[in-house]
């Protein structure tokens, strides 16, 4: 079994760019950014429970990494960068720390490196279980209307929130809930030490209005790019800013 993805081919000899979306996104999420890099072959992945991979269920990050690895092999991708937002960023960091043959580097936008104590994990598990129950049992428009009121999305205006609620409500609530629980921050290990000892290139992107993740970025041994005029979802709020940062990263 492999993950559903859309592949776009560029010039031979360059590494692939493999894009991983955030929670409730899909393979379309990164394409405005990715299509600015037409020289590179691009793979836009649907994570388990999402888009064309909605029917794929996993028990945890190890399963996701295994599926990602098999997907890369199926497309004969031998050299690549992982580019991930939020959940996709956490998947990218986990997979990279577990080891992926052919990995050139990782670019993470607003991805959490992991909680640092049992109390934080227990609180996150309670929260994610409550959200998962809502995703399983309530209309998605109602759930996402509340989801985008969370502090991490404080930079969004009302129109942006409404647009995201409509977009995300096309998902399957049950499969979103399953993925939310399987890849909760409550079950993700703290990756700070692994990332400090990494053997791959590592870059971090965060919006200038995303104070939580700017603080987290400062804890990581990573080259951090602050995206102007953007909050947590920087590639949606300022795609040109993310394109500029990614172009700078790929020039090295």
Swiss-Prot record:
Metabolic or biological pathway: Quinol/quinone metabolism; 1,4-dihydroxy-2-naphthoate biosynthesis; 1,4-dihydroxy-2-naphthoate from chorismate: step 3/7; Quinol/quinone metabolism; menaquinone biosynthesis
Domain of life of the source: Bacteria
UniProt keyword Lyase, yes or no: yes
GO biological process annotation, one example: menaquinone biosynthetic process
GO molecular-function term, one example from the UniProt record: 2-succinyl-6-hydroxy-2,4-cyclohexadiene-1-carboxylate synthase activity
NCBIfam families associated with the record: menH_SHCHC, PRK11126.1
Catalytic activity entry: 5-enolpyruvoyl-6-hydroxy-2-succinyl-cyclohex-3-ene-1-carboxylate = (1R,6R)-6-hydroxy-2-succinyl-cyclohexa-2,4-diene-1-carboxylate + pyruvate
Protein name (record): 2-succinyl-6-hydroxy-2,4-cyclohexadiene-1-carboxylate synthase
Purpose of the protein: Catalyzes a proton abstraction reaction that results in 2,5-elimination of pyruvate from 2-succinyl-5-enolpyruvyl-6-hydroxy-3-cyclohexene-1-carboxylate (SEPHCHC) and the formation of 2-succinyl-6-hydroxy-2,4-cyclohexadiene-1-carboxylate (SHCHC).
Enzyme class: lyase
InterPro entries xrefs: AB_hydrolase_1, AB_hydrolase_fold, SHCHC_synthase_MenH
Keyword terms, alphabetized: Lyase, Menaquinone biosynthesis
Family statement: Belongs to the AB hydrolase superfamily. MenH family.
Subunit structure: Monomer.
EC identifiers of the protein: 4.2.99.20
Coiled coil regions in record: none
Record has Endoplasmic reticulum as a keyword: no
